[in-house]
Amino acid sequence: FIHKENKNPEAYATLSRYAALSRSMALFFRKIIKGICKKELPEGIKPFYLFEDKDGEPRKIHVVYSGGDDLFLVGAWDDLMGFAVDLKRVFSVYTNGKLTFSAGLGLYSSTYPISRMAEVTGELEELAKNSPGKNSIALFGSGTEYHRNEKNSSAAEKENAAVYTWDE
């Protein structure tokens, strides 16, 4: 949006530019999400699979929330991972690689409360945003009993978060 090394970035930070960026991001997330869930990607981008394609079936994903540049999904872990990789790739094409993309992905049992999933994955997203260069995804698995009982640990830290750049 504004080059980091610009000597006068305030000159470009106008209300109309922010409105255009906001509108473009809302359009992207409103229109593109459904297609990625169905594995319908722009020309030249093939869907990412951790395992082989399940006979062209749509991904087993439910959109709980999508607004602005935020998104909260639940579903099969391998489909969510494929979705995250595809969303990052399509987002990079859409923004010509000019914007970073941070995400948090958690693994939960089917009985885990969705409100708690949202809270912890939000913390994971913050870990990804706070990593050097931002352009990262925070993943996690079961934490140790020690970390779960530690009073000063965030929920994401208690669950043993691992942060990776999208290039790793």
Feature locations, PLM:
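Charged, helix-rich terminal subdomains or tails
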Residues: 1-168
